[in-house]
């Protein structure tokens, strides 16, 4: 089964709504990428996806990727240089722990949505919305 078919339309809509809500008050960009398997180390794969989705090309280097390999039960959260320079060293790990705890309860969508919202809260602190802000990347989930 393709990873996209693992989610109902309502679940996909909830994740997109979380992205839109998280980005509403920040210039930061958040993307969610879901696939069945990572054929290489999960962090290496997440870095490849990060580059493929152009998260490294935001003006303030404040892109965030939430990566999930469903069948491998692996995930990663990567921030670009701009946001990584601002958040505490263990910030992404704490979001990951909360997300994985939800996954273990079978609440994949809820875990992803909460991770997106939490990342957005930090982006808002360090990269608040500017009146001339443009949405640099699409507010959507990518599947592979």
Where are these regions (language model features)?
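A structural boundary signal for the start of the first folded domain, especially the loop/turn
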Residues: 1-63, 68-144
């Amino acid at each position: 089964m393709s990873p996209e078919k693992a989610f109902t339309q309502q679940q996909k809509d909830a994740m997109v709504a979380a992205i839109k809500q998280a980005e509403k008050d920040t210039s930061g960009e958040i993307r969610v990428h879901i696939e069945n398997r990572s054929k290489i180390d999960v962090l290496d794969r997440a870095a490849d996806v990060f580059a493929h989705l152009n998260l490294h090309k935001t003006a303030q280097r404040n892109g965030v990727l939430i990566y999930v390999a469903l069948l491998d039960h692996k995930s990663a959260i990567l921030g670009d240089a701009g946001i990584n320079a601002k958040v505490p060293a263990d910030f992404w790990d704490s979001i990951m722990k909360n997300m994985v705890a939800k996954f273990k309860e079978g609440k994949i969508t809820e875990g992803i949505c909460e991770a997106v919202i939490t990342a957005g809260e930090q982006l808002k602190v360090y990269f608040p919305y500017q009146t001339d802000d443009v949405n640099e990347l699409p507010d959507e989930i990518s599947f592979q």
